[in-house]
Amino acid sequence: VFSGETPGNADVSPRAVPTGVAYHGRSTHNASASIHMSRLNPELGLWQGIALLSTSLLGTGIFVVPALAATVAGPASLWAWLILIVLVLPVAFTFAQLGRRFPHAGGAPHLIGRAFGPRLERLSALLFLAVLPVGLPAALNIATGFWQVLFDLDRGATLVIQLLTLAAFLALGQRPAKASGWVQGLIALAIVGSVATLWAFGDLPRADMPLLPPLEGDGPKLAAALGVMFWCFVGLEAFTHLGEEFKRPQRDFPLALLLGVLLAGLVYWACSVAVLSFGTYGDPARDAGALPLLFDQVLGGHAR
């Protein structure tokens, strides 16, 4: 049985404690359980953590999911975003507390290992790795789509752009978490600034598009929209590995996780208001290019 908190630079492995032995209280260097020093440098502050989390949740979803949700549920999708935020916050709070108590680079698999043993820890780690061959090509394809808006690209040029994007991912991944925090902080500002620009120059909200429209028998549509929107918050549990990289994980990690979820959810909701107001949804082509179409309508053809 494990209770209490471990310090940010210590890892108490369940395999190090003999079977049947109860281990209570805070871990110290004199404890009989084996303790390993942190393998990561604690460099992240609160704002960098918020930037890392919010931009990761926004990701490529900010460009397509609001339009997909609008196609499924229409104006009722605005309610669905708020419902989803309320549902996700307890999950975020749970992982925030786990990351605060047991900060470790292993993240969710490490927590599973503490609770259920090394076999399930390895299995869950493999499941996380299995996402890469599926998710990364999709992200690269979406990134290439933005270049195709600007240039007429053939298959060779598209492949070169995807390889360069992948190389940029790998290069940034070799840098400390602080560097990623700064880069993603700039991305977060760009995303929030883009949505704010749409609101400012698009005169949002409009009188004909209420921020919370009345619900009239939209229950099935809400459920379908929530299924689409949940994609935006899948992977929230993966952020538990960042707990070890915070300078003050006890204080900053839970705040960063909760505030990052709130910020991402509100940006999604604000983008959905813009999509619904300008009608950039309704079919696969418009859903995929919703954001460029929005800028085209609000600021003119060069803005896209």
Can you say where each PLM-predicted feature lies in the sequence?
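Intrinsic, low-complexity polybasic segments
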Residues: 3-11
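Membrane-interface "cap" regions at the ends of multi-pass membrane proteins
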Residues: 23, 29-67, 72-76, 89, ...
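Hydrophobic, membrane-embedded alpha-helices of multi-pass small-molecule transporters
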Residues: 44, 49-63, 68, 201, ...
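Hydrophobic alpha-helical transmembrane segments
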Residues: 50-51, 77-83, 122, 159-164, ...
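Membrane-interface helix termini and inter-helical loops of multi-pass transporters
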Residues: 66-72, 142-152, 204-216, 281-289
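Hydrophobic transmembrane alpha-helices that form the core helical bundles
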Residues: 68-72, 80, 89-166, 171-174, ...
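TM-loop-TM module centered on a large, flexible mid-protein loop between adjacent transmembrane helices
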Residues: 110-117, 149, 258-304
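Membrane-interface loop-to-helix entry segments
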Residues: 144, 156-205, 216-219, 257-261
